[in-house]
Amino acid sequence: MRQRVVSLLFPSVGTFHPLAEKAQMKYLDEYRDGELAQQLAREIHRVTTRPWNIMEVCGGQTHAIVKFGIDELLPNQITLIHGPGCPVCVTPLEMIDKALEIAARPGVIFTSFGDMLRVPGSTTDLLSVKARSGDVRIVYSPLDAVKLAEQNPAKEVVFFGVGFETTAPATAMAVFQAAQKGLKNFSMLISHVLVPPAIEALMSSPNCRVQAFLAAGHVCAIMGYEEYPPLAVKYRVPIVVTGFEPLDILQGILMCVQQLESGRAEVENQYARAVRKQGNQPAQKLVREVFRVVPRKWRGIGEIPASGLGLSAAYAAFDAEKRFGLGNHHVDEPADCLSGLVLQGQIKPHECPAFGGKCTPEHPLGATMVSSEGACAAYYRYRRHSVTETALAR
C-alpha cells in the first residue's frame, strides 16, 4: 500500500523519490506517513534558497496545516498564508441577516448545513432563532430539504445554499428535482461563490504578498482547473491543485517552491488521484443549467465581479430572496472583529486582539471562529495554548 502512495505522490516531483521499503499501512493513514512527511520536508529545505509566500485557498488544508504542524516543518523562508478558503466564512453579513429574517417567519421550515447555525449575523444567529421557536433544521444534503417540502406542503421550506463549486451541483440538483416535482413551497437562499475570481481579486490588490497558490482539490474535482492557467500567466504565480492530507500539502508546497525557484509560473496537479483537468462534466452541465454567474459580495473582502452563482431565469421561481421580498441593505462588520484581514491573508488569527479573549468558539465575533473550516477556529482548537497567552497579553 505504501508503495502505491509513493507512486501516486511522487511521479512528477523532480528527481525526489522517498524510499518505499515499508510495511503495508491502513488506507486512512497512508497519506499521513511521518517518515514520508519528513523526507518531503527535507526536500523542501534543500530546494528553498529564497523567501516565498504561498497561500492555500481551502479551509480543509488550513486545518490540516495547523493540526499536523505542517508549517513548523518548513524552512523559515517559506510563509504559508491562509486565504479565503472557507465558504461559510465568506458568506456576507447581509446574507446571514436575510437567513435570520426568513427563519423567524411563521410557516417557514428553514434548512441549512450545521456550520451556518452559529455564524453571527448583525444581532443574532440561526441557533438563537431556533431557540425562540423558529423551525430551523440541520440537513446533510439539499435533497433532504426537497423531501421536507414534499412532506410539509402547508409550509414554506427554504434551503440556505452556501459553498464553493464543490457543493453547487448538489444544490443545483435539489432545485432541478423541486422543479421536476412541481414543488411550489420550496425555495433557495443562494450564496454560492466561485474560487478563481477570488484569486484574481486577491492578486489585483496592491497589498497582495502571495507568490504561489495551493488550489483546493475538492473544488477542482468538480470544476477542473482549466480556469487557472490564464491566472498563472497573468500574475506570474504557480498554482498547484492540492489535496488535504499532510503528504498532499507538503508535496503541493514542494511543487510550488520548485516552480518559484526555477522562475516558472504554471498550473500543476498534485491531486491527480482525484482531479482531472476537465473536472466532472455532468456536474458542470447541471450547474450551468440551474445557475448563472453573478457578482457576489465576500465577507471581509467586498464585492467581486462574476464570483457567485444565482438562479437562472428558468429557475427564478425558487429564489427565496424574491419570494420573501427581501431587499438589499448594508450592514457594518463588528469593529473589533478582524476576520476580513484573516480571510485576505493579511494577518494570522492570533494577531487579532480579540482572539481567545473576546472571541472564542463559544462566543464568536465572526464566522472564522465558528466554522469547522475557519482559520481562527483552527488556531483556537490546535494552538490556543501556544498563542492565546500572547493574544491575551495584548
Protein language model regions, located:
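Active-site histidine-anchored catalytic micro-motif
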Residues: 151-161, 166-216, 222
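Flexible, glycine/charged-enriched surface loops at secondary-structure junctions
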Residues: 51-54, 185-186, 263-272, 298, ...
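A conserved active-site cap/scaffold subdomain adjacent to cofactor or substrate pockets
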Residues: 209-272
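Glycine-rich beta-alpha junction loops
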Residues: 58-61, 164-166, 192-196, 217-220, ...
